[in-house]
Amino acid sequence: MLKIEIVEFRRAAVLAILTGCFLFGAAALAAAANSNPTVSIAAGQVQGRLLPGGAGAVFRGLPFAQPPVGPLRWREPQPVTPWKGVRDAGESRPPCAQNSSGWNAKEAAASREDCLHLDVWMPQWPSKSPKPVMLWLHGGGNTGGAGASDPLYEGTSLISHGVVLVIADYRLGIFGFLAHPELTRESPHHSSGNYAFLDQIAALQWVHDNIAQFGGDPRNVTVFGQSAGSMDLSVLMTSPLSRGLFHRAIAESGAAGRATPLADAEQAGQRTAGTLKAPAEEALAYLRSLSTADLLRGGRGGTGAVLDGYLFDSDPSAVFAASKALPIPLLIGSNAIEMSDAGSPDALRATIQARYRDLAPKALALYGVASPGDKGSIDPVYGGPNDQWGADIGFRCPGILQGEEHAAAGFPVWEYQFDRAIPPKPNVVHSGELAYVFGNLRPTGSQAGEFGEADRKLSAAIQKYWTNFAKTGDPNGAGVPNWPKYDATSRKFMEFTRAGELAVNENQRRAFCEVFAEAEKASRANR
């Protein structure tokens, strides 16, 4: 009997210990959960995560609009439905629906239509004073890529300079840019095709309404972006719906281009609908019934602004030319080499002749392909003639012209050129500056490299310039060389050199870009 009692006692003791451990563990988990930062915003409470080492906090996967699915596919972003309780904000959400083009295979595999989310990175928790806000728009040709879920844009390094970082996703391809007469008719604004831009404005409106709860200053918002993101923010600078929502802009490798008239965009949308086998009547109901995969297989839609009389009532490039863009400071630039046309010199000559027409002889001489058999000029910074043409026509010269026209309107402009190749690559490429801007110099990932001390110093300088600009509207400040404003006489710009140094230079590709500007202005006059 005594033995049985001892055994029972031991069992009870072990059970008590296990129960105590379980309760202690549960309490510890609850305490850990409760230590995570919680914020109340317009739609409800959200709980983020503290960053290691007291580096601040991050709130991931915050919806800034209702999911644009079902009847909300191809509609303006709608306000978020409020929720009860505390919403977990510990994970970024997948990118917006897209087809794979190889470079974005990972993003395409994870993508979905329910994608209107953003991440917020805070440099302090709790916040002690309002901080400048930087909202990032990713690149990808407006057909691919990711914002918040891309580790390249991890924000710990950038926010250490005292800014709040917001990374937003927006609809892409056919989901973001399809115009169609039926969509225009159902719109209260008689508009269609600009859904991606409306998403970006909705994200900015969310920042305006909620960012103070995360320690951000809604009166000091900088939009910055690269490639398509840079083009988009430049276009937003020409929309009346953007006024008051952002106060500075950083455009990396992208400028405002031409917009498509609504009627032309609608016709393109009807062709897309036909490809998807939509009926001539009630095509919209049919298109909304299709799966995401069906739409991705059968259609692309446009990739740029539509002149709808609501979001855009004038061609964006013409708005800059008329000095009517948002009256805000602009920091703009491109990479020495962006995207190269791999064709032959003879093919390049034909391309230049078709693009520049009467101005072609001048351009052909500059690129060294004036006559059949010419191999073209090789530049130690800008590469061969195809490298030069690809960057000049697509990125560099449009950006220089946009900066010049914005400066002529009396607004402060700073221009740059980024030359540094990610080691051990031989040359800089399109998007090659991103690892430096975000301070994510890593041996793995989409911008992996064998980074050294020169790269770390260059990244630190770029981050200071970018965040100084976000704080004051001027990139200059303690610890970095003076960066002169752009002016039409000397055309000074900051060059981030191949060696990783900082150098002020003048007249960036002036002769080449003057030909571009002359051709562009003539084209505007004929539109």
Predicted regions and their residues:
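Non-catalytic accessory segments of hydrolases
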Residues: A30-N194, T444-I462, A470-N482, G500, ...
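N-terminal secretory signal peptides that target proteins for export/translocation
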Residues: M1-R11
